Amino acid sequence: MTAGRHWSYDSLKQIAIDGCTENVEQLKLIFVEEIGSRRRSDCIRTIEDLIDCLERADELSEYNVEPLRRISGNMPQLIEALSAYTKPENILGHPVNLYQELRLAEELRQQLRIAPASQNAQPSVSELAAAVPPTAIQNYATPAAFTDHKRTMVFKKISEELGRYWRRLGRSAGIGEGQMDTIEERYPHDLKSQILRLLQLIEEDDCHDPKHFLLRLCRALGDCGRNDLRKRVEQIMSH
């Protein structure tokens, strides 16, 4: 039963993914305008792919779950969960535009100085944050400076909410399958450590131009269908 339970946006998506029995080709016809192109449509083979596509197009988000309502006809649990879902408060006070946020990420990239983290046998949020020496971070007047505290908050938020599909983020960020296999072998039963190590690899990969790390991370989160987390990161950085 779903009555009285608070449902997160991620939970709604998972219910849709697990419970959908409708033909994906039929669903693609329903969302043909939102998908926008034949090329994108050809890349959609599962309900999960469709959700990713809608999120990338900013047609589906934690603030707009209407597309999930349109596919919930044969899923009673999803219907109930949607009726109990409360969208988060929009702290910006106005609708969020994907392209405006990408420009914000570009502006943040110009302001940040990020040093690569050292490798740790057992990565943790605190260890990864401590890997950047204070002297490596300039004291910007802007609140968007990437301080140790904000870095810890970003890593903590992603490690807690990214979930078991973390390899998608790795692929979107250009991390090789072999590197991700190594992460799984090193931390076979520790999802949080897997994600933290992935973030560390993404950061290390940008050591030639550390300013690119945050922009690359935000873009990768968007590309892998986690616009909700990308927004969280940008909110952390904008305060």
Curated annotation (Swiss-Prot):
Main location: cytoplasm
Keywords (A to Z) from UniProt: Apoptosis, Cytoplasm
Subcellular location: Cytoplasm
GO biological process: apoptotic process; defense response to Gram-negative bacterium; extrinsic apoptotic signaling pathway; immune response; peptidoglycan recognition protein signaling pathway; positive regulation of antibacterial peptide biosynthetic process; positive regulation of defense response to virus by host; positive regulation of innate immune response
Annotated Gene Ontology cellular component terms: CD95 death-inducing signaling complex; cytoplasm; cytosol
GO MF term list: CARD domain binding; caspase binding; death receptor binding
Superkingdom assignment: Eukaryota
Keyword match Cytoplasm: yes
Entry-linked Pfam families: Death
InterPro entries from the UniProt entry: DEATH-like_dom_sf, Death_dom
Region (Death-inducing): 1-105
Gene3D superfamilies per the UniProt record, alphabetical: Death Domain, Fas
Keyword Repeat assigned: no
Record domain Death: where: 151-237
Role description: Component of the IMD signaling pathway and is required for the host defense against Gram-negative bacteria. Interacts with Dredd, promotes cleavage of Dredd and is necessary and sufficient for enhancing Dredd-induced apoptosis.
Quaternary state and interactors: Interacts (via N-terminus) with Dredd; likely to bind Dredd simultaneously with Diap2 to form a trimeric complex. Interacts with imd.
Protein name according to UniProt: Fas-associated death domain protein
Species this protein is from: Drosophila melanogaster
Gene (name only): Fadd
